Amino acid sequence: MERKITTFGTYFREFMASLDDKAQFKINQGLLLLATQPRLSTKFVKSICDGLFELRTEWNGNIYRVFFIFDNGNIVVLFNGFQKKSQKTPNSEINKALKIKAEYYGSKK
């Protein structure tokens, strides 16, 4: 099984550009797993709400999250990402991702 990974807007590219090469590599490894594996454990993927998921990556003591949705069953659309600094995913980041999701579906009409 292979999913096509696409991005929407510049949110994800801007996030990746803010990271060092090793952190980018780790996130890309997570994306490769997401693209090629039929199921991933909650260590890597967590359902947030309303069809929104987060890809979970750790590198060098830092925790990174990238929001995505499934579109048409096999397309993964990457939204914003952030470096996590607390146990709980901040509501502000979730709300930002939900706004981007609405923007994405609005652009498909």
Residue ranges of each PLM-predicted region?
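Basic, Lys/Arg-enriched alpha-helical interface segments
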Residues: M1-I63, N72-V76, K85-K109
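Residue-level signal for short, function-critical loop segments
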Residues: F82
